A protein has these predicted regions:
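Divalent metal-cofactor coordination and adjacent catalytic microenvironments
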Residues: 30-100, 106
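Amphipathic alpha-helical interaction segments
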Residues: 16, 43, 88, 103, ...
Length: 139
């Protein structure tokens, strides 16, 4: 069995956001659950039946490997990052009248997009390495 909280902790360890620490526990868990549900639909996460879970006990009814926990946590971080990249406020700030604000916000948006792309590549690389190691070709 893999507890949701195990995956939540792995994802939170990769995020530095003081606002998350200020959220009530119930709100944070709700957000983490949403990010986890987004992450399990990614096609690059092992051969698991993620529908085999117990929402009351907040666990998957099978063990998820350490490597796949890492991949899921990366996709959870991407789910946390996605709304920030698509933020209307940020977009409005990028296209505001002041040039200095434009460049500062545009750079921030570019950095967040680059971070998202790097996280995607990291997850893909972990998946590919696991595929190569476990395919039986080298046995």
């Amino acid at each position: 069995m893999t507890l949701y909280s195990t995956l939540y902790d792995r994802a939170l360890a990769q995020i530095t956001d003081p606002l998350l620490a200020q959220l009530p526990e119930e709100d944070l868990e709700y957000m983490l659950h949403d990010w986890l549900m987004d992450a399990i639909v990614e096609p690059v996460v092992g051969e698991y039946d993620f529908s085999d879970r117990n929402e009351e006990l907040k666990q998957f009814n099978f063990d998820i490997s350490e490597r796949d926990q890492k991949i899921l946590s990366i996709h959870m971080v991407r789910a946390w990052l996605a709304p920030q990249i698509r933020s209307v406020t940020l977009t409005n700030q990028v296209f505001s009248g002041k040039e200095s604000k434009f460049y500062a916000q545009a750079n921030q948006l570019a950095e967040m997009r680059a971070l998202d792309e790097q996280l995607r590549k990291d997850a893909d690389l972990l998946f590919c390495r696991g595929t190569y190691l476990n395919n039986g070709y080298f046995d």
